Amino acid sequence: MSQQQQFKYIVRLFGQDVDGTMKVPYALAMVKGIGYNTARAIVFKLGLDKDRRLGELSDEDIKKIENYLTDKKILEVPNWMYNRRKDYESGIDMHLVTSDLIFYVRNDIEREKKIKSWRGVRHSLGLKVRGQRTRTTGRTGVTVGVRRSKAAQAAQQQQKAQASSGGEKKQG
C-alpha cells in the first residue's frame, strides 16, 4: 500500500499563498505574472494532470513548477507567451513572476519619467497613459459636473427670471 499524502489547503508557490482546493491551472493563474494560458502551458510541459487539485500535488511537483520559471524562461513555448519580450537592457525574452515583474515595471516607468517621454510625463502627472478619454472620466478631487457655456448659462438664467416673475400673484 502506498503512502497516503495529506491534502494541503494552502500551498506556498512563488512566495505566495495559493488555495490548494483549486485545480492546478487555475491555482497557478493566481500568481502575479502567470495567466491561465501560461499556466496551462506549464502544466502541459511538466506532464501534470490539469484536473488535479493543487493541494494533491507532491512537494516534488511543486518544486518542479517553481524551478520551471526560475530562469525566467518557459521552455518550448512561442515567444508571444512571454510577459516581457525583448527586454530594454538585455534584449532577451523573459517571463517574470511576482516581485520580479513588479520591479521591472516600476523601473520601466521610472526610466520613462527620467527621459521625459510622453508616457513618462503622463505617469508623473497622474494622468491616463494609453490614450484614453480624459474629458469626462478619471476625474479626481472635488470636480463634479460639467461646466456650461455662457450662452447656455444666460438662457437658463432667463428662464429662471421668467418663471419667478410670471408665477407670482399680485395682491391688491
From Swiss-Prot:
Cystine bridges: none
InterPro entries reported for this sequence: Rbsml_uS13_C, Ribosomal_uS13, Ribosomal_uS13-like_H2TH, Ribosomal_uS13_archaeal, Ribosomal_uS13_CS
Single annotated GO MF: structural constituent of ribosome
Keyword Ribosomal protein: yes
GO aspect biological process, one term: translation
Record flagged with keyword Ribonucleoprotein: yes
Name of one Pfam family that matches: Ribosomal_S13
Chain intervals for the UniProt region annotation (Disordered): 131-172
Compositionally biased intervals (Low complexity): 134-163
Any one cellular-component term (Gene Ontology): cytosol
SUPFAM superfamilies tied to this protein: S13-like H2TH domain
Keyword list, A-Z: Ribonucleoprotein, Ribosomal protein, RNA-binding, rRNA-binding
Family assignment from sequence similarity: Belongs to the universal ribosomal protein uS13 family.
Quaternary structure (record): Part of the 30S ribosomal subunit. Forms a loose heterodimer with protein S19. Forms two bridges to the 50S subunit in the 70S ribosome.
Function, in words: Located at the top of the head of the 30S subunit, it contacts several helices of the 16S rRNA. In the 70S ribosome it contacts the 23S rRNA (bridge B1a) and protein L5 of the 50S subunit (bridge B1b), connecting the 2 subunits; these bridges are implicated in subunit movement.
Name of the protein: Small ribosomal subunit protein uS13
Organism: Sulfurisphaera tokodaii (strain DSM 16993 / JCM 10545 / NBRC 100140 / 7) (Sulfolobus tokodaii)
